[in-house]
Every structure is written in structure tokens, then in C-alpha cells.
Amino acid sequence: MKVTALGNTLTGFGQALATTLGVDTTSSSPNCAEMMVVFARGTSEPGNVGLFSGPTFFDALEVMMGAGAVSVQGVEYGASIEGFLQGGDPAGSAAMAGIVEGTVQNCPNAKIVMSGYSQGGQLVHNAAAMLPAATMAKISSLVIFGDPNDGKPIANADPSKVMVVCHPGHNICDGRDLVLVEHLTYSRDAVEAATFAAARAKA
């Protein structure tokens, strides 16, 4: 109960901050584009793409790929603390796998990016393990910010397509569960991550 209450408090704070900053924390774009990003937000983040890494990453991708070239679909899932402690929300992991599979089928010419932040990174790992190798072979790149599974390979993924961004001394990346200021600063890595994803898309 206390864990759930804390999660609700953090979500409310995140949404209030997003509103103040004018950041859109929800993205649902079913239409095919040159690049399709499937993104899972972190624990207790608002919307379906969150606040602390997703929106700045998408903006940087749009600059590099061109106006209208990037479509983003956020994963709808609980993003609870309990899910994080389970190694990534099981239903959310399955939902992400389903979105990726559907995107591969419906947009065969798109460059598909699987991405997530914090617990969203756990979902990337879990979804990749659920997907067949043939589907994963069609993924252009995988980008994780603040990965709780840092150092563990992503199943069925070509390592050259993977970028994991973890700051030195980051508690979550070290496999622990204490959220410190460093965990909230991944927006500063947006350009580097977008540069990687754009290069992979054009390879």
C-alpha cells in the first residue's frame, strides 16, 4: 500500500512538472513513418512516454531525421514500483512486444527503434526476449536510458544496434532501487542517443 501511494505521488508530481514545462507526455502515432519509435516510460512517469528522457529524445530524432519522418508509439502499462521490482511489468513487456510485432508487420519499410527509460528499459529487454529472432532482425536500433539491466545483453539483438546510456554511479544502473538526482538527468543524452539511432537507420 505504501509503495503504491508513493508511486501515485511521483506520477502526480511528474505530470504537474510536465504541465509546467509544456512537455507532451503522451504519444500514439499508428501511421507508418520513415522511423517508428516504440518507447516505454519509467516507473511512475506520466502519460505513456514519460518526461525525463522520451520527449527530448524524440525531438532530437525529429531534427536529425527531418520533419514528419519520426512516429512515436508509447507503451501503455502500469509503470508501478511493483513492476520494477519484478524486473519489468509483465503485461507491459507483452504489450511492447505486441506493438513491435504489429509495427514490423504493418510498416515493413520503416526503421524501427525499441527504446525505454528505467523500468521501460526492463520492458525492452523482456519484449526482445519474447519476440522471434526474425522480428528482432528487422529492428533498426535499441536505445535504453538508465537501464536497470545494465551489462546484460538484449536477447536476439545485434549488439551493434544497441546503445545503453548509464551515468557513472547511477544507483538504478548498478542494479539497486534508490532514485537519486542522476536518474532524472537523461534528457541531456538525447542528442547522442538520437545520433546513434539516426546513423543506424541510415546504415
Swiss-Prot record:
Annotated active site: 118 (nucleophile), 170, 183 (proton donor/acceptor)
Posttranslational mods: The 2 disulfide bonds play a critical role in holding the catalytic residues in juxta-position; reduction of the disulfide bridges results in the complete inactivation of the enzyme.
KO phenotype (gene knockout): Abolishes penetration of the host cuticle. Abolishes conidiomata formation on the host.
Induction: By contact with cutin.
Disulfide bonding pattern of the chain: 32-107, 166-173
Site positions (Transition state stabilizer): 119
Reaction(s) this enzyme catalyzes, per UniProt: cutin + H2O = cutin monomers
GO biological process: carbohydrate catabolic process; symbiont entry into host
PROSITE patterns: CUTINASE_1
GO cellular component, one term: extracellular region
The EC number(s) this enzyme carries: 3.1.1.74
A GO MF label: cutinase activity
Family affiliation: Belongs to the cutinase family.
Entry protein name: Cutinase pbc1
Organism per entry: Pyrenopeziza brassicae
Gene: pbc1
